[in-house]
């Protein structure tokens, strides 16, 4: 079908927000998700694997900001991708099937090990660059 000649069109959210006024306020005191029966963030930070990976990643935040280098920022942003954490989900029953779709890993533990290895290598490079940045600051 074609939208030509119809009243339908495709707009991005910034265009919609300029064209229309809100009709009400949605109160959502907790995160809402499309994923799993709980519809919360447990698909990404709901087990020890995910929490350990998340915590290790965010311990690098201040160094990444201090380095202020586009290559490091790019990798930092990539490592924050939700898919990495989603692949580490250990949920069972109907939710477990969803987590196996499009997942390149055989298990959440394999996803965790791979992610932590990549993160450890990145941390080594961050520490080197951070050390260079600290030494370059005039006393």
Which role does the model predict for each range below?
Residues 56-139:
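Histidine-centered catalytic/metal-binding microenvironments
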Residues 17-69:
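Active-site cores of enzymes that catalyze phosphoryl transfer or operate on phosphate-rich substrates
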Residues 14:
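Hard-cation-handling environments
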Residues 1-5, 9-10:
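Single conserved hydrophobic/aromatic residue that forms the stacking wall/gate
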